[in-house]
Amino acid sequence: TPKTQYGIASCSKSFTSTIIAMLVDEGKLDYDVPIIEYFPDFKMYDEFATKECTLRDMLSHRTGLAPHDALWIDTIDRSTLWERLRYLKPMAPFRAQTLYNNTIYTLIGHIAEKITGQTWDDLIKERLFKPLGMTNSNTSADDMVKAPDYAIPYWEGKDGIVRKVDVLNVDLGGPAASINSCVED
């Protein structure tokens, strides 16, 4: 139905980048100021990248980091992921190529949290869902499965049998992939 909730996955990134754009418009952030100038504890594996990395680099997927998706799925919280960033070896030189990266988008959400003192989830709800009338959208798999109508995932096994599977919970990686919505919203 038009109200059936489903994970919009990486389309969540557009919501995160919109929150960042709002913070830039409010003068709280600048696309081209190195992250380390806002947060002295910001550290990447590469010293040059640490000194030069900006929101524009992060939003454009040009940090040189490989996706490291298992890291944001298995990490306890975003602040722990922030600390672990310094140990991730780059896959390419900084700004040399575009490497799609959920981990970096998760950290972009953490930057918004650190700047505002609000959770990313609350920022999305208050600044986007509420003003846009998105009453059937949320930021958590746990919330989605409580909804009266949500898409149930299935998987076809190697044996050809289709089976119901659990909803994948990627709440930690929310800024990259955890928004659930519906056609109506």
Question: What is each PLM-predicted segment?
Answer:
Residues 1-57, 90-103, 174-177:
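Short active-site loop at a secondary-structure junction
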Residues 46-185:
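Short, surface-exposed loop or secondary-structure junction motifs
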